Every structure is written in C-alpha cells, then in structure tokens.
C-alpha cells in the first residue's frame, strides 16, 4: 500500500515535470516509456519479484511506473530490462530518468540493508534477444543517486520528491541496445525513461552555411564533430586562414566557429550576404569592415571598387593604407638661421608651412665648404661633426662642430615626408657662415703654490695644426690698469713670481697665421697663503697617521672575525637558507589524536551544522570514508546559499573510521589561510556524518593541468606554485607536517587559486623546528616522499619541501606522472643513486634551480617555505627573469617510448606510436593527411604537425619531441627516411 501511495503522489508531480521539460538542439526520440502508457512490457529478473509495473489515474488518464521496494529482505539484486531499441543514426544517446527514492530512515528500524541508489546498465547487440537475459552482457553506466529523497513527513503529506537525472552513453557501434536497471535494496519508483539522440540543425553563421549534422563524438577525449561550411557568394576564406568550421557537440548545439568567411575586396557584409560597394566607396581587402568612403584628394570610384586613385600632384607611400588620404611632399623649412660659436655653428629653423597632409616630417642637412683664396667648393660631411645624424632629423635644430677657421660654409636643410621619394623636386633652404676663429681653448688649473699657478688647456685635434702659439694673459683681480702676457707653443704654462693668497684672472688665446683665434673665458685662480701651506703639511701628517690607524684596526677586525667564524663552522652546519627558529608561529597546531574523546576536538575546532542547511546535489567522487557530493549550504542568515563540497561517512563504518573522519575535520578547522582549503563545518550529530568544505570548481590540480595542457603562461604556472608555497609556509609556521603533498591533493578554484587539502596523512611537529614524527606503519607515496622519510619513516617540514619540488615538476609538465612508469623500487634506487627528475620542457632556469634545491639529499640544505615564497615573489615581480629556459633533453624529460619491442624495433604502425604517447585521438588526423607509415611520420616538421590539425601547444610539443627519439631509433636500425 505504501508503494501505491508513493505512486499516486508521483502521478500528481508527473504532469508538472512534463511541462517543465525543454529540449536542447534537435532531439530524435528512440524510446519514451511515458508516451507508451505501459504497453512496452519490459523484462524483470527474477521474474515476479522486485520491479513491478504499476498504474495510477490522474485527470482520468492512466499514469504508469515501474517500482521496487524490498528494503527489509536482506541483499537484493533485482533487474528491469527494456525492449531492444534500434539506434538508427545515433552514435551517442542520452538517457533521461525521472524517479523518486524513499528515505531509508522512514522504515521501521532503519532497515539496515536499505539503499538510496540504484544502478543503470546498457548492452549493445545487432539482434533482439527476446526474453533471453544475461547479466554479463551488460555494462554499468553509473550509480544513480537522488538529489532529494522522500522522507516520512513528505510521504505522509504526499509530497513526493521527484528527481531527474540524465546520462550520456557512446559511442555505440551495434544496430541496437538494451537498458537495464539494477535494484540493490532501495525503495524506487521509475516514472519516465526517455532515450534520444541529437542533431545540430542547418545553420547560416558568419557568412557560412552549415548542413544539418548528427551530434556525434570523434572519441572520448574529443567529444566534438568538426563540420566544414561553405562561404556565401562573394565571400572567401582569408589568405592564410582556415576555412569555416563548426563543432557539433553531443548536445546537438553548434559551438563558436573556427575559421571564417569574409566578404571579398569590393564587397561588404549586409546581414548574411555580401553586397558590392556603392560608387564613391571602396574596400581594399577581404575583411569584416564595411566599405569606406574614398578619402581626400582621390578621384570618385565605381561600384565594387577596391581602391580610389589619387588626384594629380598627390601620392601614396608604399606603406600607406588605401584608406588614408593622398598626400604630397612638404614645402621648404622656414626661418633657417646659422649662429657661429667659435668652431661650431648652431642651425635653427621652423617647420614647413605646408606639411603635405602628413605627420612624418623629417629633415636632412647637407654641408658645403669653400676656400676663400681659390673659391673652390666641395662637400664637407666627412670633416665636420653633427650633434645627431643629419639625414633623419625630427628636431628643428642641430649643432655642427669641428669647423675649420677662415673657411666659408653653406648648409642646406631639406624637409621630407613619406612621399618625397616619389618626386624629383626638393624643398630646402640654405644658410651660409664664415668661420674666422678657432674654438676657444678649455683651461684648467693643474697645480698651485704660494707664488705660482700651473695652468693647462686643450683645443680640438683638427685645429691644432693651424695654431702656432698660445697667448696667456693674467692679472690680479681688481687691478684694471696692468696685466702680464706669456706666449708658448705648448699646452701648459707655470705663472711665477705671484703674490701669496691672491686671486688672478687668467685667459688663454690661440694665435694662427691669419691672426688671433677665439679666446677662452676668463678664469679665477687663487694662490695659497703662507699659513695654508704650513697647514697642508700638518694635515698631510695627520692624514697619514689616520690611515695607519685604520689599517691596524682593519687587520685586528679581520683576525677577530676569522677566529669567530672558525668556531662557528666547528659548532654548526652551514645552512644556506633562513633558519625557521628565528620566527616562532603565533599559533601552534593541536593534534586531535591527543584528545581521549574525538568529539571534544570537533567541538573545539569546528562548527556544527544542522543537516537541514545542507543540500546534496550530485556525486562528484568517492573518498576514503564514503561518497563526495557537490551541494549547497545555507548561510547563517538563511537567505543565501553557497556551493560546497560534502564528504560523507559511509554506512556500516567502524569506530576507527569514525575517529579518523572527525579528526580530519578537527585538523582542517584549525587552519585559516587563503591557500588552505576552508572548512565550513561538520554534521556529527546526525547520520550520515558530513564534512562540509568550500567548493573548488576546477577540482584536483593534476587532472586540471592535464585537461588544460599548454593553455597557461609560465607566469600563471609560477603564480599557482607561489600560492601552494604560501599555504605550506603557513602550515610550517604552525609546526605542522603534511606528509602527502602532491598535485592530486591541491584543489583549484575558478580563479586559479590553488589550495592545499587532504590532511589524512598529516601529523604534528614538536616545539623543536627540527623534530620528527615517526609513523607506526602505513603506505607512503614514494614518488613524492623525501629519501629520509622513506628510509626511516621520519617526516619534517624539510621532507614537505622535497614533496613541494615534485609538485613544481608536476605543474611545469602539466600533470605528468613523476618518474613516469618506473616502479616504486626503481624510484627509490634512482634517488639514492643521485638521479633527479630532469628539466620539463619550456621550464625557466630559475624554477628548475629551485626544484633542485628542494631535492637536496641533506635536508638541512633545502630551503624553508618562507625562502621559497620570497624567491617566487621576486621572479613574479621580474617576469623577464623567467624568459631564460633551462637546458632540455626531450628524450630524457618525457621518456616517451620510441620503440615497440625490446630489441629496438621501431613502432610497426602510426596508431601504435600515437597510443604509446597518449595522443591516439589524432590517429585519424595522421591518416587523412597521408601519414600512414612510420617512415613518413619521421619526416614531419613542426609546421606539418600544426597543419594536420594538432592545435594545442602542449600536444604539438609532445608529438614533436617524441619524433626526435623516433628518428634516432629509425636511424639506428637503418631504415631509410
């Protein structure tokens, strides 16, 4: 009677469920249990037991369902099989189930054998087997768990909770198939079973037509069917681009297209067609842009024009786009002046009045020199020096130096732009200047005394041949009535017989055959006083004494430090990184196993949550203690729901399992850090017991990286590593050892934030930073564990650092398995022999060096997590430091097999080779492109790999690097290539 009551309540909900259904894409239904109204006659096993067809009436219409509810009879194995279903064109089918499940706690005594799930199976066949039923023919699709269960109060109120689940199966290869439902002790009513496949409808997208296509998947790793489209009239595939492709998903939906069609030159897009450009408009290339109006200084265009011709006197530079106005050369520069400064001339001018309509104005300066005696002239670029290159000036001034005296110079300044080279005429102005003097000498004081001044000077080397003597004029400052003159052929002079402590004005002038050259500026130099001379002697003596004292003090300090350092080296190890004892944590972790009653630890460190605040939505995995669900948690305000992950403790648990389950929650509850998984709370007073944590959308780091192979920048990967290191630094500061640090135990959220999780193997450290915890047994993850932890089962934060180095390698290889296919015994032997994981491909040198530091055999020489965070912060702040890549040998790093047999014989087939490197999804790509034999494959280039359709950078590199080893093997055995 209870089942019929359940059926009646479900019938009330059935109509609402049908009204809410909405199909995606174009669905082709193969089986619809509800529509057949009980006429299908499905097979039950064992016959007459278990599943039963029931009928209820709603709105004078019969409603049919299959139900089973043998919850108190011990172990159950009840099967319900559909009739044989012809699959038509389908390769992948969708199975939609609508059902209800009753809460096991609603039965008297809790029904210890009661379950709340059932199993879904399928079997393929080319013929209908009739009533012949064999379990071994069926393959399990999934365990079906309800999102909502019908509890006692719901059942009494006839408020039955209806669940809807959908699964996809494929690819199918036989003519038809069966579905089967296995009951293992649940109270289930199956109201609807609908099986269908999908088609992508005919579509016009981005100027390309795509035909109606059956929604199929190429393979499990490539669930999209690629469909080629055809361009509409006057549309073309862009040069060097890909033709229009759309991907038909297994859901019957078109994804964003790859490649495109563009309206050709002279045509523009109007809705879903290409139309010729109107007169006066043009389009120069196939693109998405519309036709453009002809620019200034062009002639009117005709319909469908691809360009507009320039008016007479106007031009386009080769690099000018056709959309740019036609332009002309500029006029000459304005207001050119030449200002002489000894052997220099400064040329100044202003921009031309007419720029020709362009902004790329540059100036070119040429020089001509003339000898006054003969009147001969010639170019002078080789003998003069410009302040900047003279033929591509953007400024409106330039200084010309090294000019010869008594010479006439003419300078021409030409204005040019991008079209000046298309005409023969020039636009320039000239300025002339006569140089009558040499450049002024540069004077400096070399030495002085109470009665003398030693003065030196210099002039340009090019002018020294014209100077025959130098004239030095000097006088006392303030005496305008007398002065002294000394002449010399050299570049220095000592002025004697001067008064002590007196300032003199000194000027040097060059004398040439033609007359006086330019004079230097007047310098003020002062002789020493008699007291100053004596003081200098005293100061000199004091300085020597001070120097001697400093030398003696330095020697003493050196000896003292040498002795102290020697004692330090004799008493302690040479630790290269910071000492953790310098920073004591503000908070210390408490081991929940020290509590006699684990409930006390739960009460102290966690928040108890009532199960009514938690909603389980779907199974996302299975943990050590039970199933893991994605669900929601009502906030304390009761209005907002947040997504959470829910770990459940399975029925029939032992006391040890209960203690370990609650201890993990007590451990997590003590941590609060951005890079540690956050505990929301626990359900410990109701069954099933639950641990509720924040929900991490991208799941485990290793699986996430394998799915996103090659999609992240190096900076993003280093950012992930920095987050993990920050979390481990926090744990180390709390005197806490993780013991199982690996990429599989790092969770990633939607913002790529990485958080440390899984504290099942973790243990506490004592107050001493170098204390260890010795385990009493249990499995150790060999590939991630430090050698001292493997050999002596002693774990420290230093052993966590070793594991962190392995995580770094996993991240940089996008989730490759450490040490590949080596056995655990081979891994331990290799590590003890000094082998370390080789450089990942495209790994920055600084990152690999940090890995090697983490893998130091002596644990005291490994960096602390604080050091690692600091190093990664510096690398992130200076991204250029990540551009230097470590040396990489693909045949060592990837260790992809290049032969199929032990005797070094190359792979016999291309598919065998691709399967060995886990790239079998590209087998069809190689076959279609004509690479059907190994001899052809080894001739492929990187461009060939891209051309056949391998688009992911990580997959391109994996195939390319495997080819290197393959070529070596082929050459070794002498196969011609």
Swiss-Prot record:
The modification Phosphotyrosine is found at residues 589, 595, 629, 736, 773, 922, 931. The chain crosses the membrane at residues 539-559. Changing residue 595 to E: No significant effect on kinase activity and loss of binding to VAV2 and VAV3. Glycans are attached at residues 408, 436. It catalyses: L-tyrosyl-[protein] + ATP = O-phospho-L-tyrosyl-[protein] + ADP + H(+). Residues 329-433, 439-530 form the Fibronectin type-III domain. Keywords: Angiogenesis, Apoptosis, ATP-binding, Cell adhesion, Cell junction, Cell membrane, Cell projection, Differentiation, Disulfide bond, Glycoprotein, Kinase, Membrane, Nucleotide-binding, Phosphoprotein, Receptor, Repeat, Signal, Transferase, Transmembrane, Transmembrane helix, Tyrosine-protein kinase, Ubl conjugation. Changing residue 740 to N: Loss of kinase activity and binding to VAV3. Changing residue 589 to F: Inhibits EFNA1-induced vascular assembly and kinase activity. It is a single-pass type I membrane protein. One of its GO terms (molecular function) is transmembrane receptor protein tyrosine kinase activity. Residues 1-205 are annotated as: Mediates interaction with CLDN4. ATP binds at residues 620-628, 647. Disruption phenotype: Mice are viable, fertile but exhibit aberrant development of tail vertebra and susceptibility to carcinogenesis. Its EC number is 2.7.10.1. Belongs to the protein kinase superfamily. Tyr protein kinase family. Ephrin receptor subfamily. This is Ephrin type-A receptor 2. It comes from Mus musculus (Mouse). The lineage of its organism: Eukaryota, Metazoa, Chordata, Craniata, Vertebrata.
């Amino acid at each position: 009677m209870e089942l019929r009551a359940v059926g009646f309540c479900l019938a009330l909900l059935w109509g609402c469920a049908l009204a809410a259904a909405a199909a995606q894409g174009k669905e082709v239904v193969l089986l619809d249990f509800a529509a057949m109204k009980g006429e299908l006659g499905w097979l039950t096993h064992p016959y007459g037991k278990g599943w039963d067809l029931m009928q209820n009436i709603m709105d004078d219409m019969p409603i049919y369902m299959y139900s089973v509810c043998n919850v108190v009879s011990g172990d159950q194995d009840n099967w319900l099989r559909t009739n044989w279903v012809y699959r038509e064109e389908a390769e992948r089918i969708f199975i939609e189930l609508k059902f209800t499940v009753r809460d096991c706690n609603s039965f008297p005594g809790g029904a210890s054998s009661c379950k709340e799930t059932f199993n879904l199976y399928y079997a393929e066949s080319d013929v209908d087997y009739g009533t012949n039923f064999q379990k071994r023919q069926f393959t399990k699709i999934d365990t079906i768990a309800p999102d909502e269960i019908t509890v006692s109060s719901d059942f009494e109120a006839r408020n039955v909770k209806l669940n809807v689940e959908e699964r996809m199966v494929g690819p199918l290869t036989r003519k038809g198939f069966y579905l089967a439902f296995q009951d293992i002790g649940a109270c289930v009513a199956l109201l609807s079973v609908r099986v269908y496949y999908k088609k992508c409808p005919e579509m016009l997208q981005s100027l390309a037509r795509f035909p109606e296509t059956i929604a199929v998947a190429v393979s499990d790793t490539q669930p999209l069917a690629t469909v080629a489209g055809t361009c509409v009239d006057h549309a073309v595939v862009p040069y060097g681009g890909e033709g229009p492709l759309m991907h038909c998903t297994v859901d019957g939906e078109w994804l964003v297209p790859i490649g495109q069609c563009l309206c050709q030159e002279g045509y523009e897009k109007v809705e879903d067609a290409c139309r010729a450009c109107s007169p006066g408009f043009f389009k120069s290339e196939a693109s998405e842009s519309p036709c453009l109006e002809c620019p200034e200084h062009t002639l009117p265009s005709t319909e469908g024009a691809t360009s507009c011709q320039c008016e007479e006197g106007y031009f386009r530079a080769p690099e000018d786009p056709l959309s740019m106005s036609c332009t002309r050369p500029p006029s000459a520069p304005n207001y050119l002046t030449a200002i002489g400064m000894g052997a220099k001339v400064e040329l100044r001018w202003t921009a031309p009045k007419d720029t020709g309509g362009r902004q790329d104005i540059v100036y070119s300066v040429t020089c001509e020199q003339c000898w006054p005696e003969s009147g001969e002239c010639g170019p002078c670029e080789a003998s003069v020096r410009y302040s900047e290159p003279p033929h591509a000036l953007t400024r409106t001034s330039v200084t010309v130096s090294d000019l010869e005296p008594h010479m006439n110079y003419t300078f021409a300044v030409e204005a040019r732009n991008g079209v000046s080279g298309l005409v023969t005429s020039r636009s320039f102005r000239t300025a002339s200047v006569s140089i009558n003097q040499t450049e002024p000498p540069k004077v400096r004081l070399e030495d002085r005394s109470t009665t003398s001044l030693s003065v030196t000077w210099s002039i340009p080397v090019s002018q020294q041949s014209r100077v025959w003597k130098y004239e030095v004029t000097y006088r006392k400052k303030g005496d305008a009535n007398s002065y002294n003159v000394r002449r010399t052929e050299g570049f220095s002079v000592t002025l004697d017989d001067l008064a002590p402590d007196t300032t003199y004005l000194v000027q040097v002038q060059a004398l040439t055959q033609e007359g006086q050259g330019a004079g230097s500026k007047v310098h003020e130099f002062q002789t020493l006083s008699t007291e100053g001379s004596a003081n200098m002697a005293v100061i000199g003596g004091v300085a020597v004494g001070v120097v001697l004292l400093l030398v003696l003090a330095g020697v003493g300090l050196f000896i003292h430090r040498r002795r102290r350092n020697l004692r330090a080296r004799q008493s302690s190890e040479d630790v290269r990184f910071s000492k953790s004892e310098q920073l004591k944590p503000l908070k210390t972790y408490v081991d929940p196993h020290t509590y006699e009653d684990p409930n006390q630890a739960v009460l102290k460190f966690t928040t108890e949550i009532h199960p009514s605040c938690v909603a389980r939505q779907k199974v996302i995995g299975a943990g050590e203690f039970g199933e893991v669900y994605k669900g929601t948690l009502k906030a304390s305000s009761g209005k907002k729901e947040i997504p959470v992950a829910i770990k459940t403790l399975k029925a029939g648990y032992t006391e040890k399992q209960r203690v370990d389950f609650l201890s993990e929650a007590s451990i997590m509850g003590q941590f609060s850090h951005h890079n540690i998984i956050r505990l929301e709370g626990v359900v410990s007073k109701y069954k099933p017991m639950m641990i509720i944590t924040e929900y991490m959308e991208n799941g485990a780091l290793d699986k996430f990286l394998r799915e996103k192979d090659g999609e992240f920048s190096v900076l993003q990967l280093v950012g992930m590593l920095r987050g993990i290191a920050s979390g481990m630094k926090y744990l180390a500061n709390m005197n806490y050892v993780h013991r199982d640090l690996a990429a599989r135990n790092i969770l990633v959220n939607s913002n790529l934030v990485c958080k440390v999780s899984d504290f099942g193997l973790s243990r506490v450290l004592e107050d001493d930073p170098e204390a260890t915890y010795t385990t009493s047994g249990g499995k150790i993850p060999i590939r991630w564990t430090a050698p001292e932890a493997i050999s002596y089962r002693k774990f420290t934060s230093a052993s966590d650092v070793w594991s962190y180095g392995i995580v770094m390698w996993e991240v940089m290889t996008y989730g490759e398995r450490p040490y590949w296919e080596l056995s655990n015994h081979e891994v331990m032997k290799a590590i003890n022999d000094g082998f370390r994981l080789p450089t990942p491909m495209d790994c920055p040198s600084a990152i690999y060096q940090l890995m090697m530091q983490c893998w130091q055999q002596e644990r005291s020489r490994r960096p602390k997590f604080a050091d690692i965070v600091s190093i990664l912060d510096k690398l992130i702040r200076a991204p250029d430091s990540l551009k230097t890549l470590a040396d990489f040998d693909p045949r060592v790093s990837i260790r992809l097999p290049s032969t199929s047999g032990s005797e070094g014989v190359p792979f016999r087939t291309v598919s065998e080779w691709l399967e060995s490197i886990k790239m079998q999804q590209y087998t069809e790509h190689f076959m279609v492109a004509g690479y059907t034999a190994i001899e052809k494959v080894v001739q492929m280039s990187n461009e060939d790999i891209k051309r056949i359709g391998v688009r992911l950078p990580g997959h391109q590199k994996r195939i390319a690097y495997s080819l290197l080893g393959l070529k070596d093997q082929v050459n070794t055995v002498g196969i011609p290539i």
